[in-house]
Amino acid sequence: MFSKLTEAQKQFFETGRTRDLAFRICQLQLLADAMRKNETVLEEALKKDLGKSAFESYATEIGFVLADIRYTIQNLQKWSAPKRVRTPLYLFPGKSKIQKEPYGSVLILGPYNYPVQLLAEPLIGAIAAGNCAVLKPSELTPHVSKAMYQIVHSTFKEEYIACVEGGAVSYTHLTLPTIR
């Protein structure tokens, strides 16, 4: 199963769609919309798993993620632009720049203490950078894990962003090969 998933993500990444700035911004907006739409579901899951109140859930998890998505969307064009750097004299008349490139596919393992925030924050970075991602929520927060699974699967295609559930045994099989 995991080899098929990683192969599908590799093929999707190689199409080059994830490198497009407009695509990345659109995907971040889709994530924000899904988080807003499922805010109550996430609050209930956090209450069941960790005993968090609705206020605490929003302040430390959901609202935090939504604010970071907004900030990322506002700054992504600037962050993605090539950065000019000094060219050594012996390379004159050449010009040098740093061009940021996506890695390919990212594995994000979620902890139990802030299960939404610490799963979604790296996902925001992965999407912004132009990567595909596999999310593995903590098995110690089963309600949040189920909610995140549903959010991811209803929002993204599996060959782009996937979410897998299960215990420690499942993530030992989730080693991702380097796409490049």
Give the positions of each predicted feature.
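N-terminal Rossmann-like NAD(P)+-binding subdomain of aldehyde/semialdehyde dehydrogenases
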Residues: 1-97
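Rossmann-like NAD(P) dinucleotide-binding subdomain of oxidoreductase/dehydrogenase enzymes
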Residues: 89-174, 180
